[in-house]
UniProtKB/Swiss-Prot annotation:
EC annotation from Swiss-Prot or TrEMBL: 1.1.1.-
Residues forming the catalytic site: Y67 (proton donor)
Xref: PANTHER family: AFLATOXIN B1 ALDEHYDE REDUCTASE, ALDO-KETO REDUCTASE YAKC [NADP(+)]
GO cellular component: cytoplasm
Record's protein name: Probable aldo-keto reductase 1
Assigned keywords, A-Z: NADP, Oxidoreductase
Organism: Oryza sativa subsp. indica
Positions with a binding annotation for NADP(+): S214, P215, L216, G217, K218, G219, F220, F221, S222, S223, G224
Top-level lineage group: Eukaryota
Binding positions (substrate): H135
InterPro entries: Aldo-Keto_reductase, NADP_OxRdtase_dom, NADP_OxRdtase_dom_sf
GO molecular function, one term: aldo-keto reductase (NADPH) activity
Amino acid sequence: MAAAAMATVAVPRVKLGSQGMEVSAQGLGCMGMCPAFEPPKPEADMVALIRHAIAAGVTFFDTSDLYGPHTNEVLLGKALQGGGVRDRVELATKFGKFFAGGKPGIRGDPAYVRAACEGSLRRLGVDCIDLYYQHRVDKKVPIEVTIGELKKLVEEGKIRYIGLCEASASTIRRAHAVHPITAVQLEWSLWSRDVEEDIVPTCRELGIGIVAYSPLGKGFFSSGAKLVDSLPDHDFRKLIPRFQPGNIEKNAEIFERVNEMAARKGCTPSQLALAWIHHQGRDVCPIPGTTKIENFNQNVAALSVKLTPAEMAELESYASNVHGDRYPLMMANTTWQDSETPPLSSWKSE
């Protein structure tokens, strides 16, 4: 599949959830453009990539006030200036996860929610955020309280749609009862499928769209085990159990099998992994991240890869025995498995 052909794949539009939001069938995750522990990528190159994406039909951009921190939103804001660009894109950002004094924190209290939104609006240079996610659930604050403040921001015209990240099915239900949730962002890929049992069916029952982050297994399905050798010293992926010695060697076999199938299909392993996500349904939008136009073009080309039910089953069989968890133990309390909040009756506002 030639690079020139990759850039010409038509990107469909899809409904994200049932509240009226429409996005490109594949988005662009922007986190890697401003790595937390490395120098940022050249701004001009990243702006060029974002504008290339828009020209190619990918208009759904994902960022967060955590990334940088803050600099990722500033970068995206610059890329969307001028020429009516803002009106052509769907802008998603997040709040609630931060570092203070070198330590991670999570907040979802009303005052923090409002201040975070105002900060993101300012950095992005926009009047309204299309999709505003709670980046991680604050287990100290009833989810009804957090969503209640987000509902006010919708009513004030500062955000259009509300989303959650890494939330359990019960938390999603409680949130949705306060104000309709448009999308839930979760890790979903060939080797991260635990959300399929409860969360995905809950979203579909409630008419909530699904945004799949890390659809390439945090880069694993792009280059396999050799990815680990190329990671900078401070890259957090070096802490992930799946990439640790003892596990990565066993997981390498998964990549080799996927790579063999990709060769038969005339595509790359990363395109095959993305195609698998696309075949989960039109209510699922993956947001692979990249900092290179060449890789972006390859990712978009995944939209043209067709899989039969037998091929889907074959792919899934390759990744049925993954070695190692998707997050290190110190981050396990920030996943959907540990995202329950106190009952609303326990809340005493300050």
